[in-house]
Design a protein with these regions (language model features):
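Membrane-interface helix caps of multi-pass small-molecule transporters
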Residues: 24, 49, 78-90, 111-112, ...
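Single transmembrane alpha-helix segments in multi-pass membrane proteins
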Residues: 2-57, 87-92
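Transmembrane alpha-helical core residues of multi-pass small-molecule transporters
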Residues: 40, 44, 75, 101-105, ...
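Transmembrane helix-bundle core of multi-pass membrane transporters
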Residues: 90, 94-159, 184-187
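Alpha-helical transmembrane segments within multi-pass membrane transporters and channels
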Residues: 55-102
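Helix-loop-helix "hairpin" substructures at the membrane interface of multi-pass membrane proteins
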Residues: 64, 79, 83, 134-203
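Hydrophobic alpha-helical transmembrane segments
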Residues: 8, 18, 38-39, 66-74, ...
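Interfacial loop-to-helix junctions that mark the boundaries of transmembrane helices
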Residues: 2-10, 59-70, 128-142
Length: 203
């Protein structure tokens, strides 16, 4: 693959990862999370803050890349849990509930790095958003493919997929059959937070 097709797949990989989580959210709650763009900004800012330590252009990384990724995952999943709690337990419409982070998220992202845009010059960190030497495709394409395969297996061989669809089709009927609709809706937003973390890390 080369040229425009590779570019399209590269840029589309971020959207593909987000679509995985958004599909679960839409299936369970019947709404969309409009704050994903702002949450990605927060996730990326957390990564930069951990790796750069508040400096604009550090000579070396201030923390291992895996630590930055884990911090990004924790923050993104907490933001997803915040949205999920508003929708699942406070019964707020998804678009209204996620409007909070949609409005505040980018300001939070700017605050994390003191309105600066740090630059990371470490070559190994660049591999996650570009190419790993020796591989024919950009790394984000591989990461997106792995995420799609994992969620497909989870939905196919676990109860999560069935429960998510059941709650989305008829929440009250699911409750009468022993499911906990609020918990399942909450879980889908947390999973979306994880997807946002991965997308924010590679982009």
């Amino acid at each position: 693959l080369s040229g425009y097709l590779m570019t399209i797949l590269d840029y589309g990989s971020e959207l593909a990862i987000l679509a995985i989580g958004m599909t679960l959210v839409t299936a369970a709650s019947g709404g969309q999370d409009i704050s994903v763009g702002a949450t990605i900004a927060v996730a990326g800012s957390v990564v930069l803050r951990v790796l750069c330590g508040g400096e604009v252009s550090p000579a070396a990384l201030h923390a291992p890349i895996i630590v930055a990724f884990l911090a990004c995952v924790v923050v993104s999943m907490l933001l997803g849990a915040f949205n999920g709690a508003l929708v699942a337990y406070f019964k707020i419409q998804p678009m209204v509930a996620t409007l909070i982070l949609f409005t505040a998220g980018r300001s939070i992202a700017a605050w994390i790095n003191n309105n600066q845009l740090p630059v990371i010059n470490d070559e190994s960190f660049g591999w996650f958003g570009n190419f790993i030497p020796g591989l024919p495709l950009p790394t984000p394409i591989f990461i997106a493919a792995i995420c799609i395969i994992i969620i497909a297996l989870v939905l196919r061989f676990t109860k999560l997929g069935l429960f998510t669809q059941a709650v989305g089709i008829n929440s009250e009927s699911s409750r009468l059959n022993g499911l906990n609709p609020a918990r399942i809706k909450f879980m889908t937003y947390v999973i979306l937070g994880l997807c946002v973390a991965v997308a924010g890390f590679i982009k």
